[in-house]
């Protein structure tokens, strides 16, 4: 609705995890570098945690882009599956055509695929999002996948993404073997006020028809209100930013001030009281 008015090619605050819109704060850049290091050095297990909306999924998309074509990747977005369903999902994500099999059949297929990848001098990476939703048994199943190896190296690098509950779950005695195998751990916090401002400007620049001459501007008062309401959580910044642009369109102004930001925040709070 407001794209044409503000001369935007696309909506700047869409909540889909598009790496083009990824703004790397210092902590996001550090986390990405740690993930890349762990995978490229074949460290086996990697764990990234953060509160809801801090950018874990978007960071995983950036990770996939950074890895390049020499890495075969499988991304599991909904890991609430049985052991057999999880193995089938992993095999399918790696692009291996398969008919319905039992657990051992999928495991054999996965092992064959990983050996072929390894013999070609390439690597395979499994990324599991929302890993905190997995049962202890499912996490143990994932641990067993790390036993797929040659005499020299692991065949599969595994990256677990999840909310802070994942860390608490991994601390359980029955998962101590898995916890001991995690060699790289990262945690994402919410952004501070300065990063919130830079984040807003970055997304507007990416979406603008003319990035050097933006037709809409969030003034310092608006940025303070957005930070106060969102607490620096990217997902909430996106939600209030989108509604603030809509308010600017309604009031026919390209200057988003604290009043419009408060209007946007109030609308969001009314629609989603838990926001």
Provide a role label for each language-model segment.
Residues 1-42, 275:
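A short, basic N-terminal segment
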Residues 11-13, 70-72, 81-100:
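Conserved NTP-binding/hydrolysis module of P-loop NTPases
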Residues 41-62, 79:
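Walker A/P-loop nucleotide-binding motif
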Residues 47-52, 58, 105-109, 133-141, ...:
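Sensor-1/coupling segment of RecA-like P-loop NTPase cores
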Residues 63-66, 166-181, 190:
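Short regulatory helix/loop adjacent to the ATP-binding pocket of P-loop NTPases
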Residues 76-80, 170-173, 183-196:
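Conserved AAA+ ATPase "SRH/arginine-finger" region at the nucleotide-binding site
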Residues 82, 98-141, 150-154, 191-196, ...:
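Mid-core helix/loop region of P-loop NTP-binding domains shared across ATPases and GTPases
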Residues 177, 205-275:
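C-terminal alpha-helical "lid" subdomain
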């Amino acid at each position: 609705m407001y794209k044409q008015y503000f001369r935007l090619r696309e909506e700047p605050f869409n909540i889909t995890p598009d790496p083009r819109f990824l703004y790397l704060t210092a902590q996001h850049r550090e986390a990405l570098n740690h993930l890349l290091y762990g995978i490229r050095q074949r460290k086996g297990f990697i764990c990234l945690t953060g509160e809801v909306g801090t950018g874990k999924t978007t960071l995983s998309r950036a990770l996939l882009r950074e890895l390049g074509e020499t890495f075969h990747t499988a991304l599991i977005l909904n890991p609430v599956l049985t052991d057999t369903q999880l193995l089938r999902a992993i095999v399918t994500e790696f692009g291996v055509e398969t008919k319905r099999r039992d657990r051992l059949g999928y495991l054999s297929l996965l092992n064959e695929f990983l050996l072929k990848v390894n013999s070609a001098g390439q690597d395979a990476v499994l990324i599991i999002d929302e890993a905190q939703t997995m049962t202890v048994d499912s996490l143990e199943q994932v641990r067993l996948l790390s036993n797929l190896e040659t005499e020299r190296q692991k065949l599969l690098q595994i990256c677990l993404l999840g909310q802070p509950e994942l860390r608490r779950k991994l601390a359980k005695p029955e998962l101590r073997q898995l916890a001991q195998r995690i060699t790289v751990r990262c945690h994402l916090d919410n952004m501070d006020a300065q990063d919130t401002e830079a984040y807003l400007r970055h997304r507007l620049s990416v979406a603008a028809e003319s990035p050097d001459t933006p037709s809409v501007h969030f003034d310092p008062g608006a940025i303070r209100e957005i930070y106060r309401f969102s607490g620096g959580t990217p997902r909430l910044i996106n939600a209030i930013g989108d509604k603030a642009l809509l308010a600017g369109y309604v009031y026919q102004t390209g200057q988003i001030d604290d009043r419009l930001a408060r209007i946007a925040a109030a609308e969001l709070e009314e629609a989603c009281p838990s926001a």
